[in-house]
């Protein structure tokens, strides 16, 4: 179970799909509440900053779809849920963040929190591609007539090829003996695509290598004091040499996997990075040019005690140094989860919603993470 306590092994991805449609948190949680009298949803708006009176957050200033500036006042608290990029961006625009950086941007400092925008974590991703010897890949299904047929089936029945993202199979593995729980994730796709996500014009498949416990840390910084300017995102993928070593191990593990007899009828030549790419220098060159993101950005407003210099929120998600403000999204994770972040973020939000409402928590469960009995001596 990629989201459970026993993660190690091969399995099928859980997906938030309902009746053939991708089911976002908005559809699952917001749509059923749209009719509530105490809920107003404002779309196509850009929040400029949080309003503060002294050290208390009193509301938000935003520009609506017509270009008018609107002050929304809070009766109790403001909950910031703009994500691992948007939340630190808005905090800093509001004067909550690293003092030196805010002053350099000409922003008055309301709370000096050095950790805002720091500690950026993600799951770096690298793809290996192989020719498929059997005509079983999805390549023919990318032809116009096939896509029309798949679309019609989805419209009528809500199933078929259009009801999946086709990342069905996943493996969570330990890179070597001594590693307690998975630090690599392999995601298998029945089609290979180029850098622009256009399908290769042949039967092929690809396997993604994801670093689940990367050591490198990035940051989010302001580009200016203009809310419309996107922030600077420094991902810093593979900056730590340990991450390069782990990614190289992942590549070699994939090659070992597809060399097994079970793959012999399917696996053709390695398209990318190519079987000739073997040395550390050759692999590093490919990693430098082709490492990408699994879009699991997190940890830029991390939770921790006030004694932690880089902590931004406390255990109830309240922002240190100010009152009337909580951050509720993946930015408050201290460390990125060693699996996909969607389910953990929803779990985090559900837990904090109970905390905000003052509901009694469920009875705690002491369920330790499963470890292979021989993990100290064997990789598998």
Which positions does each model-derived feature cover?
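Glycine-rich loop(s) and the adjacent beta-strand/alpha-helix scaffold that form part
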Residues: 50, 59-150, 161, 359, ...
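Rossmann-like flavin
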Residues: 1-24, 101-115, 236, 241, ...
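Glycine-rich nucleotide phosphate-binding loop and flanking beta-alpha elements
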Residues: 48-49, 85-87, 309, 334
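FAD-dependent oxidoreductase catalytic-site/capping-region signature
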Residues: 1-3, 11-14, 136, 151-344, ...
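General small-molecule cofactor/ligand-binding pocket signal
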Residues: 40-42, 108-112, 187
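Conserved redox-cofactor binding core of oxidoreductases
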Residues: 1-57, 61-63, 127-151
